[in-house]
Amino acid sequence: ENAKEFVLIDFFIVAEGGLWDKMHDILKRKIKEGVEVKFLYDDFGAAIRTRKYFKQILEHEGFEVRVFNPIMKYTSQLYMNFRSHQKIMVIDGKVGYTGGFNLARFGVWKDTGIRVRGDAVWGLTVVFLQMWEASGHDKEHVDYLKYKVMQDVQGDTWCQVISDGPVNNPKNPIESIYNQMIMYSDQ
């Protein structure tokens, strides 16, 4: 609700209902206030949980929308395992959220999410923009620096964002990092 410049959103599962409806109302209001909203979702995670023209409805409301790996009816090449399970939200380049949660309710469900401030937000922004570019049909390059915000955050916690999704495979940086941490551990 405090966004002034932009909101970047990337989720695997989007389901119409309480959680999405509340966020949708806030985002529509922010768009009317002039806030840029980029919304990216995985088609497999939303296809059976949203209405038929979900993307077009959002675009009509002023959202910039991209769908990762759209499911095309009657196609012989369905890439069902090539999905984006990333969950990212960046607000004005100052606050970022990520974790295991989706924009859907699944009954009693415990999950973890984190809020980050400082330079880690830029890491989430870059991951989002890489997926945004990969999900576009045009080859236009996104001006990443438009979303770079100089942070004035003090703290003693270090955080590094590492992307390991469809844009980065087959390199699997997360696996390499875990292997390296195990190799160099003292215990």
Enumerate the predicted regions with their spans.
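Charged, low-complexity intrinsically disordered terminal segments
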Residues: E1-Q187
